[in-house]
Curated annotation (Swiss-Prot):
GO terms for molecular function: alkylbase DNA N-glycosylase activity; DNA binding. Its EC number is 3.2.2.-. Coiled coil: none annotated. Keywords: DNA damage, DNA repair, Hydrolase. It holds the Pfam family Pur_DNA_glyco. It comes from Desulforamulus reducens (strain ATCC BAA-1160 / DSM 100696 / MI-1). It is an enzyme of class 3 (hydrolase). SUPFAM superfamilies: FMT C-terminal domain-like. This is Putative 3-methyladenine DNA glycosylase. One of its GO terms (biological process) is base-excision repair. The keyword DNA damage applies.
Length: 190
């Protein structure tokens, strides 16, 4: 599987968020390989009140201001990690949250990591997919164009995309920056 090049990420964030739909999230860990089709994303933009980089650069969000095509993994609600992809130009401070993935390969490993059997419960939500794929804070700042964690080109045709508002935020909740593959049963919420 061919990783997406850095140029893919170095573009307008909402475009990247849409075009990530249908691509493959791949993690080749010591435990085994997991692969899933990205089916739901959210864009977080400079000046967007819900974006971690909206106010200023901090040690936590500094990766968002770095080169595109890197992982931004952060801890939220004191219990879960979330996986984002840094986008746009260096210095901008934007990213795409990967909200849901359709599990394709490494299902038994995903079930073991999640402690769940039902396929829909493995990766339908940002915290679930991070756990199922074994993504940790150690992946923060890592390049997604090479290495064990990457996003790959898919041979499937471009999916039909549905656009709506983001989930689980207060500020910027009215912005239409959530994208998902229409009629896909593995999205986190309709």
């Amino acid at each position: 599987m061919q990783p997406l090049p850095v140029e893919f990420y170095a573009r307008q964030t909402t475009l990247v968020a849409k075009e990530l739909l249908g691509t493959l999230l791949v993690h080749n860990s010591d435990e085994g390989i997991t692969v899933g089709k990205i089916v739901e994303t959210e864009a977080y933009l400079q000046g967007d009140p819900a974006c971690h980089a909206a106010r200023r650069m901090t040690p936590r969000n500094s990766v968002m201001f770095g080169p595109p095509g890197r992982a931004y993994v952060y801890f939220t609600y004191g219990m879960h990690y979330c996986f984002n992809v840094v986008t746009a130009s260096e210095g901008v401070g934007e990213a795409v949250l990967i909200r849901a993935v359709e599990p394709l390969k490494g299902l038994e490993l995903m079930r073991k990591r999640r402690g769940r059997e039902r396929l829909h419960e493995l990766c339908a939500g940002p915290a679930r997919l991070v756990q199922a794929f074994g993504i940790t804070k150690e992946h923060n700042t890592k390049e997604l164009t090479s290495g064990p964690l990457y996003i790959a080109v898919s041979s499937e045709p471009s999916p039909e995309i549905h656009t709506t508002t983001r989930i689980g935020i207060k500020e910027g909740a009215d912005l239409p920056l959530r994208f998902y593959i229409k009629d896909n049963k593995f999205i986190s919420k309709k």
